[in-house]
Amino acid sequence: MNFPQNLKYTNEHEWIRVEGDIAYVGITDYAQEQLGDIVFVDIPTVGETLEAGETFGTIEVVKTISDLFLPLAGEILEQNEALEENPELVNKDPYGEGWLIKMKPADASAAEDLLDAEAYKAVVNG
């Protein structure tokens, strides 16, 4: 299982990569593995400003739908349009082409309070 060191993580299995005043959000390798084959990603919150921990969308797999939680407060700028035609990108490349949203964090420094790779690995391994 992959735990990139340059990302921050949540207990709900989302990752965030801050690049200046923009951040990318996705689900972790562990999450996609546990979910199974992703068939649909729904991000109805583009253009909205949400608080950390709020639901920003859902991921649908063959037998269930899972909520997606925002790691930091901020505005959802765009969703990954490639997932409309190819939702399996989340399974194939969760930290790269399978990113879910691009956002503008209200306070990007708040990412420092999230889990680093080692702390997230401890969550996954129980």
UniProtKB/Swiss-Prot annotation:
SUPFAM superfamilies: Single hybrid motif. GO terms for cellular component: cytosol; glycine cleavage complex. Keywords: Lipoyl. Residues 22-104 form the Lipoyl-binding domain. Its cofactor is (R)-lipoate. It holds the Pfam family GCV_H. Binds 1 lipoyl cofactor covalently. The glycine cleavage system is composed of four proteins: P, T, L and H. HAMAP family: GcvH. The glycine cleavage system catalyzes the degradation of glycine. The H protein shuttles the methylamine group of glycine from the P protein to the T protein. NCBIfam families: gcvH, PRK01202.1. This is Glycine cleavage system H protein. It comes from Bacteroides thetaiotaomicron (strain ATCC 29148 / DSM 2079 / JCM 5827 / CCUG 10774 / NCTC 10582 / VPI-5482 / E50). The gene is gcvH.
